Amino acid sequence: MKTSMFLTLTGLVLLFVVCYASESEEKDFPKELLSSIFAADSDFKVEERGCLGDKCDYNNGCCSGYVCSRTWKWCVLAGPWRR
């Protein structure tokens, strides 16, 4: 049952890619498709996110309101549940 669902889903994905490729007149289709899927707005990275998720260590601190996680070594929100 799981195998047939996986094969069906894989077939649908391949059908979508083939249909999209046949309609596309661009020669660098894979690069364009991947760049459109993983495109990110540069303003969103800097202004919205702030320091959340930035790598840190105890010598190199985080922004105001964030602390360096002992476990993962990145900046997380400071709160009463943090030790």
From Swiss-Prot:
Prosegment residue ranges: 22-49
Signal peptide region: 1-21
Any Pfam family the entry gives: Toxin_12
Superkingdom in the source lineage: Eukaryota
Keyword Cell inner membrane appears in the UniProt entry: no
Notes concerning its domains: The presence of a 'disulfide through disulfide knot' structurally defines this protein as a knottin.
Name this polypeptide is given: U5-theraphotoxin-Hs1a 3
